[in-house]
Every structure is written in structure tokens, then in C-alpha cells.
Amino acid sequence: MNQICLEYFGNSVARVKKALENLKNGHGVMVLDDENRENEGDFVFAAETMTVEQMALTIRHGSGIVCLCLTEERCQQLELPMMVEKNSSTFQTPFTVSIEAAKGVTTGVSASDRITTIKAAISQTAKPADLHRPGHVFPLKGHPKGVLGRSGHTEAAIDLARLAGLKPAGVLCELTNDNGTMARAPEVIAFAKKHKMTVLSIEDLIEYRQTHMETNFS
């Protein structure tokens, strides 16, 4: 990631700290990965605090595929198997089966219904029967070591929520342009400025965890 284009949001450490503060206060952030990887920017919200209004914004400007990033332990608790036994996707995106809240939703696709599903999945007392399968929310299972084990948006979302002192669960969705193409760094930065959101890179988060000895969450 060309860090120069992110200087508007501060240096690497400042961007992470600002992102954590925003998440603590219930706001979303934009996360960029490497241009040699997926080369895209994702909305990232803490699952614990995401609102219906934020979900509506995400659906309106995103790809429509809203993902709930969960730890391996939470996926086991909810008995969420992987979507396929052998993952042959380019970046090994760790999709589990999709989900829907068993109660409190209609079609499951509205912003309100998706928030209901997310809250059901991250509830302290959540159990497998609380979720129907398939559904309109797509869980992703994070690497146990976070971004230090896999430099993906999934791990970044979980790490950011955890470092912000919230439940280790995040919601993400890729930002798209009005013509349906994927938003790259310039478009992501322009969108973030317009909507007063912080932008950081996964590289920023990796460096932050390494520098601050945040190498083990156990």
C-alpha cells in the first residue's frame, strides 16, 4: 500500500489510533489492503455497535455482500461449518454457511433484518438454534492470530474491534463505485473524506500490533 496517499489521515500509528477511537464511539472506518492483493477498500464496523442507519449506508454504497467477521471460537459455538470443504478461492476467503436470525426478521435482507441477525450471532448467550441457515449475512472465520496470521479484511475487522475494547466481531462490505466497479484507494479516500470516515491500511494495523507487542490476544 502506498502510504503517501493516506497521509491526510495522519501517520500509520495515528490512523490506527483514530480508527480505534472511532469504533469505540460507534462510527465506522474504511480499511484498505495491499494493491497487490485484493486492492479494495472495505467498510468496517464493530458488530456490537453497528446501527441500522450504518447498515443502510453500507448496502447503498457497497457490494451488497455484508459479512460478519467472527473468531474461530464463536464459529464453533454457533456450529457454523465452512461453506465448502476445500477452499479454492484466490485469497482463501473463509466463508462459513450464511445465516439469518431465527426470530425478529421477515425476508432477512433489509438493513434492519441484517442488524437483527448480526446481534443474534454475537449475543453472549447465542446458540446454534438462534440462527437459520442459509441467510443474507455471510460470516467469515478469522485467523486465530489476526492480521499477523492472515493479512485480510476479515482479520482486520476482528482485530480492530478487539483493540477498541469491544466484542471481537466486525462487519465489513466492499465499497463500490456508482458504476458498479470496485473502489480503489483514490475512490475510497474521496468517499471517506465526504462521509468523515477514517481510512487505514491493513499494513498499518500489522505494524501497530507488532510495535505495541499486540502479537497475542490469548
Curated annotation (Swiss-Prot):
Site, Essential for catalytic activity: residue positions: 136, 174
Cofactor stoichiometry and binding remark: Binds 2 divalent metal cations per subunit. Magnesium or manganese.
Catalyzed chemical reaction(s): D-ribulose 5-phosphate = (2S)-2-hydroxy-3-oxobutyl phosphate + formate + H(+)
GO cellular component, as recorded: cytosol
GO terms assigned for molecular function: 3,4-dihydroxy-2-butanone-4-phosphate synthase activity; magnesium ion binding; manganese ion binding
Binding positions for Mg(2+) 2 per the UniProt entry: 38, 153
Top-level taxon of origin: Bacteria
Pathway recorded for this protein: Cofactor biosynthesis; riboflavin biosynthesis; 2-hydroxy-3-oxobutyl phosphate from D-ribulose 5-phosphate: step 1/1
A Pfam family of this chain: DHBP_synthase
GO biological process: riboflavin biosynthetic process
Root EC class: lyase
Co-factor(s): Mg(2+); Mn(2+)
Binding site residues for Mg(2+) 1: 38
InterPro entries recorded: DHBP_synth_RibB-like_a/b_dom (IPR017945), DHBP_synthase_RibB (IPR000422)
Disulfide bonds: none
Keywords: Lyase, Magnesium, Manganese, Metal-binding, Riboflavin biosynthesis
Keyword Glycosyltransferase: no
Binding-site residues, D-ribulose 5-phosphate: 37-38, 42, 150-154, 174
Enzyme Commission designation: 4.1.99.12
Keyword Lyase applies: yes
Subunit record text: Homodimer.
Function field: Catalyzes the conversion of D-ribulose 5-phosphate to formate and 3,4-dihydroxy-2-butanone 4-phosphate.
Family annotation (PANTHER family): 3,4-DIHYDROXY-2-BUTANONE 4-PHOSPHATE SYNTHASE, GTP CYCLOHYDROLASE II-RELATED
NCBIfam families from the UniProt entry: ribB
Name of the featured protein: 3,4-dihydroxy-2-butanone 4-phosphate synthase
